[in-house]
Amino acid sequence: MLKLERSNINNWNVPISMFVECAEERMTKVVPVSDAVAQIADGAVVTVSSSSALGCPDAVLAAISARFEATGHPQNITSLHPIGAGDVYGVKGIDHIAKDGLLSRVLAGSYPSGPSSAEMPQIWRMIVEDRVAAYNVPSGIMFDMHREAAAKRPGVLTEVGLDTFVDPNRQGCAMNERAAAAPIVERAEFGGKTWLYFPNISPDVAIIRATTADERGNLTYEHEGAYLGGLEQAIAVRNNGGLVIAQVKRVTANGSLRPHDVRVPGHLVDYVVIDPDQKQTTETLYNPAISGEIMRPWSSFSVPEHGIEKVIARRAAMELKRGMTANLGFGISAMVPRVLLEEGYPDAVTWAIEQGAVGGMPLTGFAFGCASNADAFVPSPQQFIYFQGAGFDMSFLSFLEVDVEGNVNVSKLGKKPYLTAGCGGFVDITAKARNIVFSGWFEAGAKIALTEDGIKIKAPGKFTKMVDEVEHVTFSGRRAREQGQNVIYVTERCVIALQGNGLVATEIMPGIDPQAHIVGPSQGRVQVAENAKIMPKALLADAPMGLVL
């Protein structure tokens, strides 16, 4: 038998089969996945650690589905997903359990999303057809709920989400009629202030993922792109007398894991199941640069192609100063670190993303939510505490639509709901952020030419993103004004400031006619300041713009 010491746990040339063989002979917590999921009772509240495909315990979710198909159990479970499980590119995640009779209620920070060309995920069909009570709860609040349940406190009291769709004065997180009929949040007065109160939902089962387990169930995360919330979810379940199932890539003997590397101690884990083929993240089996095992040269990162979205990202980047810490979201905003790279500032700003990476270069595309060359990986629950308390200097986020109050929607598209994942950590991040830069298109579908002299509008768009009232309030402009938050919206035509009298364009892109291209298309919802400036033409050049931080 192979004896695995600390010295050879880091030798990744050892065949996985040897780890598995060792586990089968000596480790009582390692069981077939079918045996582990057989312990999940009808009506259980099941919490899942995942962020799309990143850290997704997909084999366990698939086994729950298989058991249900074979036996009709477990029935009517509630599923909790602080961030979201699965994607539309081969890791089914929550879609494994999106079945009538199996899933009766789901609370998630986000849901699988994809392009309009992709098939609608099954969980979205259930939501739209009102076959499951579905809620979109900010990711940070969901982690808070686990912490409060673990400590046997009555629930979460928070200002996060006030005057947004999270607020019961609006939708109260409900995504359909079944959810609206069973509220999970209420308003409360305490200490002379208004709060949102989320009563505890105590989890019975935790399904988490790591890279390696030893015979006692101690878990390490050396191949993972983030820790996510596995520890907090396991504690919440253990403290409520429940069951913790950990999916790992391999198993090793006791004593071979360095204590400082163990992120979830074995006394919290009941069963370990092995999936040697678990993907690190979407479309990625394993990349050591994502897990921080190697550092990439800055020259190996691509810079954005020349185009309108890059111009928007460049203007957003001009808000930064050297030494800042900034939060980063999906969409056009995700290009901002690459703009800094092209300008010669690869590490002048510390980036913090909700999955837990701090510093380095946030990745884009399928690897969004991960970073290479990170300074640190922070568990997601702690990252969200940092976000909710606005410890960072600036946040770069995107928008689907903006209304006259400055409200932003990123969480709902009624016609094609699966094109957006929901709110994720957006509400937590923006609740008290001191400085917010939203980036997006002023109009959808306009024909635009980009020249070194300016933006040329050749044909108007199908519709403006500046509307009377957003479909879903993910960010409250009214509350931002009350709190004195500094908010701007960067578009291909102008920079808009949220002011006391509404939306005011304070900077105009070269080539843009303020009346014809801003006031007119927005039907007066965006006004132009008398002293509005013209943005520098360097933003438009197909070359570095000479940014100075």
Model regions and ranges:
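Conserved phosphate- and dinucleotide-binding cores of soluble alpha/beta proteins
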Residues: 2-20, 24-38, 52-68, 86-298, ...
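Glycine-rich phosphate/ribose-binding loops and adjacent secondary-structure elements
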Residues: 37, 65, 75, 303-305, ...
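Short conserved AdoMet
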Residues: 41, 239, 321
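Short glycine-rich or small-residue beta-strand-to-loop segments that form or flank ligand, phosphate
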Residues: 45-50, 78-82, 107-110
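Helix-coil boundary and N-terminal low-complexity module in membrane systems
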Residues: 73-80, 102, 135
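Hydrophobic/aromatic residues located in beta-strands of well-ordered beta-sheets
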Residues: 77-79, 244, 326, 351, ...
